[in-house]
Amino acid sequence: MKIPFIKMHGLGNDFIIFDNIDNPIIHDAKFIIKISNRRLGIGCDQVLTIENTDIHENFKVKMYNSNGSETGACGNGTRCVADYLMKRDNLYSLNIESISGNLPCTKVDNVVTVNMGKPKFDWEDIPLSNEQNTQNVSLDEFEAFCLSMGNPHAVIFMENLDQLERLDL
């Protein structure tokens, strides 16, 4: 069986996108894990599915990590989906509904931007496994600043790029 998909890249992340408006497919964790595998599948960081809504220029997007779990908003993935939908429907603005909330997207001079909203800094909103100061999280020799923009992020400030080589992620 042929299953149509779109493969897109955004700032170092790659995505497999299924347009469930035009070609609905059933996707479960097992399917997502299989197609996300870089050796045995297509390979990606996340799988995104576009769902229809009753509101014009609104689209629902479900986002899944490569382990099959549903996740909150991803800015790079949202921009990729918005770019695809804007080209498909000749739009310059649209709204994407995610489990993290509504994400307004615009296109100006062929550049797609998304308003991810305000960052969340409370350890429970990120979420971290235990209560701690999110503005000073120790990662071996580095200090991180933790926040959520729909999914968890850790920001590490460095004096110079040479320090990047010492960072073992």
Q: Can you say where each PLM-predicted feature lies in the sequence?
A:
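ATP-dependent small-molecule kinase catalytic core of the GHMP/sugar-kinase superfamily
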Residues: N90, E97-M158, D162-R166
